[in-house]
């Protein structure tokens, strides 16, 4: 099976690097899926998006992201997010509280976290 090298990096940490069969991300142009052999491109992530990685040897990984970019080159995709959290790390009660925050950034991150959790559980 063909694979692509994938990296998910936030400003704070490297979340994942490895071989994947597909990566999907929500960009300002819509949701895209990147498979091995994809044409080179650069995209801007939406402010409260979800990235899904389908590793070659494991279950799919879902992360909430806050802004950033993705870059696709020959057989490699790099997702660089301003902020990111794995759906499996989300405290759903806290994310629900974040939706009530007066700070727009906090509300957006809460929304992204809950969307990632729903995607993981679907």
Curated annotation (Swiss-Prot):
Region Disordered, residue ranges: 97-122
InterPro entries according to UniProt: ATP_synth_F1_dsu/esu, ATP_synth_F1_dsu/esu_N, ATPsynth_dsu/esu_N
Composition bias, Basic and acidic residues: 97-112
Gene3D superfamilies tied to this protein: F0F1 ATP synthase delta/epsilon subunit, N-terminal
Compartment annotation: Cell membrane
Keyword Metal-binding applies: no
Keyword rRNA processing in record: no
Primary localization: membrane
Superkingdom, taxonomy of origin: Bacteria
GO molecular-function term, one example from the UniProt record: ATP binding
Keywords for this protein: ATP synthesis, Cell membrane, CF(1), Hydrogen ion transport, Ion transport, Membrane, Transport
Membrane topology: Peripheral membrane protein
CC annotations in GO: plasma membrane; proton-transporting ATP synthase complex
Similarity-based family: Belongs to the ATPase epsilon chain family.
Function: Produces ATP from ADP in the presence of a proton gradient across the membrane.
Database matches in HAMAP family: ATP_synth_epsil_bac (MF_00530)
Subunit structure, as described in the record: F-type ATPases have 2 components, CF(1) - the catalytic core - and CF(0) - the membrane proton channel. CF(1) has five subunits: alpha(3), beta(3), gamma(1), delta(1), epsilon(1). CF(0) has three main subunits: a, b and c.
Name of this protein: ATP synthase epsilon chain
Natural source organism: Corynebacterium aurimucosum (strain ATCC 700975 / DSM 44827 / CIP 107346 / CN-1)
Record gene name: atpC
